[in-house]
Amino acid sequence: MKHSVQVEVGGRPMVFEAGEIARQAGGSVLMRYGDTVVLIAATKEDRIREGIDFVPLMVDYQEMSYAAGRIPGGFFRREIGRPSEKETLTSRLIDRPIRPLFPKKYCYETQVVATVLSVDMENEPDVVALTGASTALHISPVPFQGPVAAVRVGRINGSFAINPSAKELLESDLNVVVAGSRDAVVMVEGGADFVSEDDLVDAIDFGHKAILPILDAQDELQRRIAPVKEAPPEVVRNESLVQAVRDAAAAEMRAVMTTPEKHPRRDRKKALKERIQAELVSDDPDRPKQIDNILEDLEKEVVRRMMVEEGRRIDGRRFDEIRPINIQAGVLPRTHGSAVFTRGETQVLAVVTLGSSSDEQKIEALAGETFKSFMLHYNFPAFSVGEVRPLRGPGRREIGHGALAERSVKAVLPRDGEFPYTIRVVSEVLESNGSSSMATVCGSSLALMDAGVPITEPVGGIAMGLVKEGDKIIVLSDILGDEDHLGDMDFKVTGSERGITAIQMDVKIAGIDRGIMQRALEQARAGRIFILGKMKEVLSAPRPELSPYAPRVITIMINPEKIRDVIGPGGKVIRSIVAETGAKIDIEDSGKVVIMSPDGAACDKAVERIRGLTQEPEVGQLYMSRIVRVTDFGAFAEILPNIEGLIHISQLEHRRVRKVTDVVQEGDEVLVKVIEIDKDGRIRLSRKAALEKPEGGGQ
């Protein structure tokens, strides 16, 4: 039986349809928003997956080319291989707000698949897919503790807008996705053009209010379908074992969790675990796992109690204190720009490479083919956390962290046309103990300035945490990895002194109100300003010159009709220019020519050659010409490559000329002036206009 629920979102109907499509999935919903249609299906296995301590949830978002009336590229002409960066980022966007809503100890393999079936280029499918994922789980047997919903918030001409169109987003200084439940915001992700903390909180509030009717629609659909929900996994506590572990480990756990350094703390924690396992050994095969879980709960309790009752963090810092910062710029001799940013036990090497327009990244998406001239790639090798792992391509986490840093830095890059380079930044995480993505933002900003990229201002980032126990609220600046794991909210804020450029926030508990969010953002601003001050002590502005090893790029415009003259038959002309100068030359259909070479003189020589081939004659300009043909009524002269004009016999001399050959011969070089170009493009030249008139006149 088909069920349909409709709600207005952002002035347009959002339709939830279930019961007719993908009926063998545990729960499925067809979401319609404008002409954007997304199918979301949620399914779980019947068997428990043994031996895991995490929610076995897979979220896959896929965009089908047919949704936009396109056929995929490549030999196979089908969607195969790795998901695109956008698909990966959207999968993460869906995963983050729904994963915490699975019951504790949930051990059934569960998959959520969101498939874009139609897209209208105005209504982004990502927030539709996120809302649909919650709906599919809500109407399935899965004991999902939702629902949640999401909207995109923009600000156009000072007014907030829900789910602005693609065209409106171009004019918006804010682009954030807000996901929430009925009681609280659970996730915020997006970028901005230097908005204030107050404005950001207003935007989040605005988005949360728009979410409430969408949650009502999900509840109404669930009421109509009336799924039989499975009972959440029963959490059975062995109270005697809990007490035994606490008695044996509590005192030492506090000593362990006040060890400032990461690896000594890890080693002491491991030794404590091994001691407790040995003391409480049993024939019960589940005993080791039970002890591990009890120790994990004890660790969380000890750390949180230290903060609430003693005002003490794991490494002894104040709640708003930033770890020691060390910065080095220009550390690599042959790269175009580099910097090492170290904050506590987190260290990042950022390296900048400059290239030409041919180095831009081609993006094939539903909206069509586009090109990226700025890329930021984040690498997280195993050695950065003292582990051993095969080297593989970037995972979802690395792609997500790179996208956050890219969004943060993009706001300060020179605008199109101001800096004719493709820019790639690579962040190599060399050590990690929390906030490596924020160290990437700081290191990338420094490396760009070291490369001489004219960014408008430095950008810094800070990762914040929150602990809430009853009415006691603690906001933590520059969190460690353990603090991230044990806290109630994790959010990353980036920006300059002017305002925020990006935010990523995940809330793990209810009850985070506007006041708490405002306080956390203000403390984040203070930390960001402190970090920016440290950065400016080392490098306060972009270097005035590019690296001597960076390519020199010159961009010129030519008449598109002249492109064939530059390329020549079979590419003969352009190959000769490249061979002669050593420069790399890219020509676009618009007539834009980009010349690049490590040698500035080579660039200049290539420009001279191209200008010579494409220069247009101008009335009133003087040209050194070559006589190519003589007639009774005048001489034809070549003033530019393949461009000829007529010097009429009357324009050869100030005096009367009886015979053309009395003045010029074929092959002579003579200075001429363009005196007219008629509507048919014929050029009239004058030799006498280029000569000084003799004293006393002359005919």
UniProtKB/Swiss-Prot annotation:
Residue ranges of domain S1 motif in the record: 620-688
Chemical reaction(s) catalysed: RNA(n+1) + phosphate = RNA(n) + a ribonucleoside 5'-diphosphate
A Gene Ontology BP annotation from the UniProt entry: mRNA catabolic process
Keyword RNA-binding assigned: yes
InterPro entries in the record: ExoRNase_PH_dom1, ExoRNase_PH_dom2, ExoRNase_PH_dom2_sf, KH_dom, KH_dom_type_1, KH_dom_type_1_sf, NA-bd_OB-fold, PNPase
TM spans (from-to): none
Source organism superkingdom: Bacteria
Subcellular location: Cytoplasm
Binding residues for Mg(2+): D484, D490
Function, as annotated: Involved in mRNA degradation. Catalyzes the phosphorolysis of single-stranded polyribonucleotides processively in the 3'- to 5'-direction.
Family affiliation: Belongs to the polyribonucleotide nucleotidyltransferase family.
Protein name, as recorded: Polyribonucleotide nucleotidyltransferase
Organism: Syntrophobacter fumaroxidans (strain DSM 10017 / MPOB)
Name of the encoding gene: pnp
